[in-house]
Amino acid sequence: VLESSELAKKKGLSIVSGLCWRYDYGVRETINRILDGAIGDVVSIQENYLTGPLWHRGNDPSWSQMEYQLRNWIYFTWLSGDHNVEQHVHSLDKAQWILGDTNPIAAVGLGGRQVRTDEKYGHIFDHHAVCYEYANGVRVHAYTRQQAGCANDTEDYVFGTKGSCQVLKHEIRKPNGEIAWKYSGPKPSMYQVEHDELFRSIREGKPINNGHYMALSTMVAIMGRMATYSGQRVTWEQAFNSTVDLSPKAYEWGDVEVPPVAMPGITKEI
């Protein structure tokens, strides 16, 4: 993917990744202020993506196992990476953005499949918690859950030496808790902005290329899954150089093996 991104850059082609919060005006302005020092040096970030269960498309006797998995792709790691990749990557991407798109050096995590246990939900977990370690001492604590009847919260909490921030509230606070700044500008749909800026870049011959940070943020999410599935401390080098292959034996309309649910301390992910 990184090579393809570089090739697109050489050819003057645009890539807009779908990591949509980078196109939200309020989030952009808020994170730009963090990057400009509005809360001092960032010391830690808490990323919450705590939601209820998602959809399931059911089954049909006429479907092959391959078709069934494609229709219910979020529940199979070869298609989704688990929900801390396909969903929580949006939160992790904001943390990466705030930290200058630098790689974490390691991750330690825990997770499991406690509530969503029916075999129709494939083999993914229903909760993950990961601590990412960065070379400058910053820790990113990332929590994601898809369980019914629990407290929900989707927010980015950023803590600095001179204040704190809730990114999705577009709000920066002083150390005493008083609001120091709050975004009050326009709030167009970030999905529309993605398309507008992509089309503008093509018309004006000024390519946008999100490929590099898209690949790295996705790798951060995958690294987190490796940590929660294995129960081990996973380094960036181990994750990036992993030879684990999640793909099916053949891409054809037929039976596809469903891997067993990961067991931390037993499952090998590296």
Kindly give the residue locations of the regions a language model identified.
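Active-site beta-strand termini and strand-to-loop segments that position acidic
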Residues: 131-136, 159-161
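Predominantly a Rossmann-like dinucleotide-binding segment in NAD(P)-dependent oxidoreductases
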Residues: 9-17, 21-122, 150, 155-157, ...
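Serine-hydrolase-like catalytic core of hydrolytic proteins
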Residues: 1-10
